[in-house]
Amino acid sequence: VNWKKILGKIIKVAK
């Protein structure tokens, strides 16, 4: 699992 991609998506959604 690519946590970097998941975290990036979460950060984009959070913003």
Curated annotation (Swiss-Prot):
Annotated Gene Ontology cellular component terms: extracellular region
Function of the protein: Antimicrobial peptide which assumes an amphiphilic alpha-helix conformation upon contact with membranes. Insertion into membranes involves Trp-3. Penetrates into cells once membrane has been permeated. Active against Gram-negative bacteria E.coli (MIC=1.4 uM), P.aeruginosa (MIC=14.4 uM) and Gram-positive bacteria S.aureus (MIC=9.0 uM) and B.subtilis (MIC=0.7 uM). Has cytotoxic but no hemolytic activity. Binds DNA in vitro.
Tissue specificity note: Expressed by the venom gland.
One GO MF term: DNA binding
Chief place where the protein resides: secreted
Effect on the protein of changing residue 8 to A: Slightly increased activity against S.aureus and E.coli, reduced activity against P.aeruginosa. Shows hemolytic activity
Signal peptide span: none
Swiss-Prot/TrEMBL GO biological process terms: defense response to bacterium
Species the sequence originates in: Lasioglossum laticeps (Bee)
Post-translational modification: The C-terminal amidation is required for full activity.
Name of the protein this chain belongs to: Lasioglossin-2
Similarity field: Belongs to the lasioglossin-like family.
Lineage summary: Eukaryota, Metazoa, Ecdysozoa, Arthropoda, Hexapoda
Modified residues (Lysine amide): 15
Keywords of this entry: Amidation, Antibiotic, Antimicrobial, DNA-binding, Secreted
Effect annotated for changing residue 8 to K: Slightly increased activity against E.coli, reduced activity against S.aureus and P.aeruginosa. Shows hemolytic activity
Localization per Swiss-Prot or TrEMBL: Secreted
